Amino acid sequence: MVKAVVGANWGDEGKGKITDMLGKEADIIVRFQGGANAGHTIVNDYGKFALHTLPSGVFYDHTTSIIGNGVALDIPRLFGEVQQIVKQGVPQPKLLVSDRAQIVMSYHKNFDAYEEERLGGKSFGSTKSGIAPFYSDKYAKIGFQVSKDLDRKSVV
């Protein structure tokens, strides 16, 4: 059986928590889009975790978590989250990343921050994680994909 948790582009609507609850029974959990915005908080036997990049399934050793090609992949943040959960006693997650996932670059974050500053009191409340500039590049097909930047033998 397939279960899907799909948001209506509202952002903070509880998708991560619902996915975590359903993850107890899932073999595979796929994060198909989005980036390291506000994130979601998971509380379990290992502790309390604020995830921004990792799919919720990383806490279940029977579950394979997949980051799909629609995700705004912030690689340093991804590595940091994996290190943090492992440090707190979570087994190394089974994690696959699409080779077509596009990478959030530092200039995406810088542009996001500059735009917020430029807008001043009319800013839209960005998390300054580079998501809007990232997706502009993705849809213009000018970004950097994982397949172009990482050695195939690299393990996340």
Language model feature labels by segment:
Residues 1-3, 24-27, 37-38, 45-49, ...:
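Short coil/turn connectors at secondary-structure junctions
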Residues 39-113:
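Glycine-rich, N-terminal phosphate-binding loop and its surrounding beta-alpha-beta segment
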Residues 80, 84-152:
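Hydrophobic alpha-helical hairpins/lids featuring a short glycine-rich hinge
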Residues 8, 12-17, 35-36, 126, ...:
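Gly/Ser/Thr-rich helix-start
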Residues 2-34:
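N-terminal phosphate-binding or glycine-rich loops at protein starts, especially the Walker A/P-loop
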Residues 32-40, 113-119:
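Short, mixed-charge, low-aromatic patches
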Residues 155-156:
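Conserved small/polar residues in nucleotide/adenosyl-binding loops
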Residues 7-10, 14, 66-77, 96, ...:
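Catalytic cores of large soluble enzymes that bind and process phosphate-bearing ligands
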